Swiss-Prot record:
One of its GO terms (molecular function) is heat shock protein binding. This is Chaperone protein DnaJ. Keywords: Chaperone, Cytoplasm, DNA replication, Metal-binding, Repeat, Stress response, Zinc, Zinc-finger. A zinc finger (CR-type) spans 134-211. Binds 2 Zn(2+) ions per monomer. Its cofactor is Zn(2+). Belongs to the DnaJ family. InterPro entries: DnaJ, DnaJ_C, DnaJ_domain, DnaJ_domain_CS, HSP40/DnaJ_pept-bd, HSP_DnaJ_Cys-rich_dom, HSP_DnaJ_Cys-rich_dom_sf, J_dom_sf. Transmembrane segments: none annotated. Participates actively in the response to hyperosmotic and heat shock by preventing the aggregation of stress-denatured proteins and by disaggregating proteins, also in an autonomous, DnaK-independent fashion. Unfolded proteins bind initially to DnaJ; upon interaction with the DnaJ-bound protein, DnaK hydrolyzes its bound ATP, resulting in the formation of a stable complex. GrpE releases ADP from DnaK; ATP binding to DnaK triggers the release of the substrate protein, thus completing the reaction cycle. Homodimer.
Amino acid sequence: MVDIDYYELLEVDRNASFEEIKKAYRKLALKYHPDRNPDNPEAEEKFKLINEAYQVLSDEEKRALYDQYGKAGLENQGFSGFNQKSFDDIMDFFESVFGETFGGGFGSRRRSDEKYPLDLSIEMEISFQEALFGTQKEVHYSFKVPCSACKGTGAKDGKLTACPECHGRGQIYYRQGFMTFSQTCPRCHGQGEVAQEHCEECSGKGYRIEKEKITIDIPEGIDSGNRIRAQSRGNVSASGMRGDLYITVFVQEDDHFVRYNDDIYMEVPIFFTQAALGETITIPTPRGERELQLNVGTKDKEQFVFKGEGFKNVHTGKKGNLIAQVKIIYPTSLNDEQKELLHKLQESFGVESKPHEEKFSSIFEKVKNWFTK
């Protein structure tokens, strides 16, 4: 079976902006939404594909992978689309993009079974060196587990009654003109049930806080904003399901090296005589000492590239480069002997030492003629 192009699915150009993609998704999702196409399996399948396409094209990293390698590239990174997801998962994604009141007339397909999100997000700071070479880090964090006294209900003895606000539906509905909207019940938070009396053990929250520490692998080449997923390390539901822990990484800046994508930049200060004469110098790089051959007449801000000495790309495995940029240092004060030596050196070059005179001689003549006419 030939893969369907995500851009064709959403009917957008390959250079479409995020807003254009979102607008196209909104239009098509409304058109093929199952509530507007009851008993129409073709529309339901199209709705699934539209959501899959949007989930990829609305994510900068996934879109870049897809543009370069197609669906195979996504699958290699663990993204398998909606094929193995339940329809409720797809509806959850739909509502996460546009909210529960999106579109009007679409009721919630299922009541939330959880009192709190199962997935957890935390942040971690690592050094420049740790990002370059990869490492292992110990993570300490807190997560929620159901209260054993009330079995996660928040009610004394676990006794619940239908929510009087939404009459047990978990949703409340209201009309605006000819449109019907729904939103999560603010009293029971979508549960459809409320406690007759609050559990004394957890004060009605339905959970307690526990602490945990785990060791995670930081891959070589990770960058700020990248997330690491620790499966089944999140909050625990009343039914025993456990969410995932997502760790967002932030890389500290280094005093000597600067990262740009997968390349590393460093500044190499040299004296003006070294630039003029040329010289081989030893420079410290993140991966050890390297020899830098300065050519005769090296220019200020001239760059020298050390291939494969940069960061490893976490997706492709290819390493970036180290770019050493020269900064020429000139003396700010001279003694008499140094001045004399420099004057002699300048004289030894003759007219070569005053390139501005040759450059500007014709301009001087031209300007004179402007005033003699």
